[in-house]
Amino acid sequence: MGFCLTATNSKYSFDGGYGGFALLRQNIANAWDTEFGDHYATLRLCFRKSDYDAFNKEAERILSKERFADGGEKSNDQDIVDFLFASDCAGSISPKTCKKIYDIIKDIDFHGEIFTYATHSDGKDYEHLKDFLLDCYKRRAKARWY
């Protein structure tokens, strides 16, 4: 049981466990905004309702800062937030969001870090992901996971 990230008529398909998908989104959150990424990492530590309530309160506090408000440098990034909090089981992102994520991670060297099943990985998961995201944008295809 796990996730599959792909797009219609794509030569790319990423299969992994939910932990790998969480790691992928954690790395994107860190690259997008350091403060938010640091907080997003604590989501894995939530076990009780009170943990989630505290997490949500702090997430709202961070996202209410000027850089996320109208006119701020990240004011048009609600789709990134939506991606980070979407269901692990099924979801999709638009070609425009694929391009945004590509732009966020394109210059990062992930040093062979993987998010797919290790037995299926060539150690270049993030390099392939960058190509996949750009391909989705160019072909106007939604990226989807299930």
Which stretches of residues belong to each language-model region?
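Acidic (Asp/Glu-rich) sequence patches and key acidic residues
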Residues: 1-146
